[in-house]
Each structure stands twice: as structure tokens, then as C-alpha cells.
Amino acid sequence: MGIRVYRPYTPGVRQKTVSDFAEITTDKPEKSLTRGFKRDKGRNNRGVITSRRRGGGHKRRYRIVDFRRSSKLNIPAKVATVEYDPNRNARIALLHYRDGEKRYILHPRDLTPGTEIIASPDAPIEVGNALPLGKIPLGTSVHNVEITPGRGAQMVRAAGAMAQVVAKEGDMVTLKLPSGEVRLFRKECYATIGQVGNVEANNISLGKAGRNRWKGRRPKVRGSVMNPVDHPHGGGEGRAPIGRPGPVTPWGKPTLGYKTRKKKKLSDALIVRRRKKSSKRGRGGRQS
């Protein structure tokens, strides 16, 4: 994938960059693998906003992606197309299985149409093949990783993401995740060889507010410019300070650096090293 840069012939195009979509081979999805996508606009069943700054966006259909590769064990499949998916940054690949079934999977980097892949404990270590973690050699890059065997992949699914197999001991396999966290997984958990495609997704510059609106993202208003009835940071004359020991959410809970993880979370036993710390305070400590 490459990034296309434009000449600044309008203000909205000056900072704009887009993917060149070089890996895409068709612009029409497999109709049997799509369904309607109802946009809930961040509301619950009562119409109350539960997730702020959501709403609008371009109409789209949801592509049904197969995250449980182990459900098609020992059945070879040929990569038919690589397609754009409006619901995620990663591309998706359409597989034609030898038994006649069609399924979408996340498109691994460098996987091209015509390649034959398979999910099997005895599959070769090649990009696109899925194997149990216990069968994957140390140092191999993987993605689309299961947390619970047979439940389907839940980790390492974002565009450009990959984890690395760093150790094996008994029934557990140690992976280094994209966040820097080192974590234990059951050796029966399936993972796909390689890195998720569209690795340049993080380098795309939207260039204007309208492109965020196309994605269904609404403006983010700072609490300090609200009225006190709307946010604890609001009110005062001019640019007033927060007036509290630290920043809080609209509901008065501490935020920006405040730890919210449960102290007795069961998965703590599987985490060898916590992820890298992110410093949100450094990017303007009053944005809640």
C-alpha cells in the first residue's frame, strides 16, 4: 500500500492524504456475506446517549468476517479477491473453499489473489495459514489471535498489527502484543501467520473535519468551554482553571491517567508484563 498526497488546490485538500488502494482487486463485495448495518448513533434502547460524539456517517453494509478460522480445519481455500471494508482499517480477503463455501478473512500483508491457504495444526508456516499457537515456531509474527480456544480471534486484528511468539512452556505460549504487553495464551488458541495488511493506515491524514463526519465521528467539545451545568470544568470568566485537584469526566470521575483497571482482574495471572504507558496528560490535560 502507498499513500497519495494532493497539491493544495483547496484548503481541505492541503493536509489530505489517502490510500492508493493498490491492493484492492474489486469494488463489489460478495453479497451473500454482507448484511444491513444499523447505525445506533451512540444511543441505547431508550434513546439515551451512552457513547458521546457518535452519529451520522456514510451509509454502509457490514461485511461478515470469519474470525474463527478453526471452524474450517483441513479444508484448503484459494484467495479470490482483496476488498475494501468500510467498517475497519484493515482490508479483507474473500476465500473460496474447496467445499464450495465462501468466507471473508482479514487480509494479511503480502497475501495475493490466487494463493492457497489452509487452517490446520499441520499447515506450513506461510502467510495466511492458521495454526494453534503451540505449533508455531518462536519468533514468528502472527495476528488474529484467539483468547479462548474455539471462540474466534479477539486480539491483534487492527490494520498493520502483529504479535510475536517469544516463548513456550507447558500448555502456555507467550506472545508480545503490539502494545508492548507480554501475555500468556493457551497453546490450543489459533492464530494466523503474518501481519495484518494496510500497514500505512496510521499515517493517513484526514485533512478536514468533514472526513471525520463521513466516518460517523462528531465534534469533541472541551469541558472547559461548557457551562457548569454541562461539565465540572465549565463556567468562570474567560479561560478559567479547572478548580479541582485534577481533571474529571462530565460525571465527576477522575480521568487522564487515572487507573480504571480492576485490581483483582482474573486475566492478571496471564499478563507477564503490562503494556507501555501512554501519556495522555501531555496532549492537553483539560480535554475531557
Swiss-Prot record:
In what ranges is there compositional bias, type Basic and acidic residues? 29-43
Q: Which GO terms describe its cellular component?
A: large ribosomal subunit
Which Gene3D superfamilies has this protein been placed in?
2.30.30.30, Nucleic acid-binding proteins, Ribosomal protein L2, domain 3
Gene Ontology molecular function: rRNA binding; structural constituent of ribosome; transferase activity
Can the keyword Ribosomal protein be found in this entry's annotation?
A: yes
What keywords would UniProt list here?
A: Ribonucleoprotein, Ribosomal protein, RNA-binding, rRNA-binding
Q: Which Pfam families match?
A: Ribosomal_L2, Ribosomal_L2_C
InterPro entries attached here?
NA-bd_OB-fold (IPR012340), Rib_uL2_dom2 (IPR014722), Ribosomal_uL2 (IPR002171), Ribosomal_uL2_bac/org-type (IPR005880), Ribosomal_uL2_C (IPR022669), Ribosomal_uL2_CS (IPR022671), Ribosomal_uL2_dom3 (IPR014726), Ribosomal_uL2_RNA-bd_dom (IPR022666)
- Region called Disordered, residue ranges: 29-59, 210-288
Q: Which GO terms describe its biological process?
A: translation
Asked if the record carries the keyword Magnesium, the reply is no
Q: Where is the composition biased (Basic residues)?
A: 210-221, 272-288
Q: What does the subunit comment say?
A: Part of the 50S ribosomal subunit. Forms a bridge to the 30S subunit in the 70S ribosome.
User: Its biological function?
Assistant: One of the primary rRNA binding proteins. Required for association of the 30S and 50S subunits to form the 70S ribosome, for tRNA binding and peptide bond formation. It has been suggested to have peptidyltransferase activity; this is somewhat controversial. Makes several contacts with the 16S rRNA in the 70S ribosome.
Q: Which family does it belong to?
A: Belongs to the universal ribosomal protein uL2 family.
Q: Protein name, please?
A: Large ribosomal subunit protein uL2
Quick one: which gene encodes this? rplB
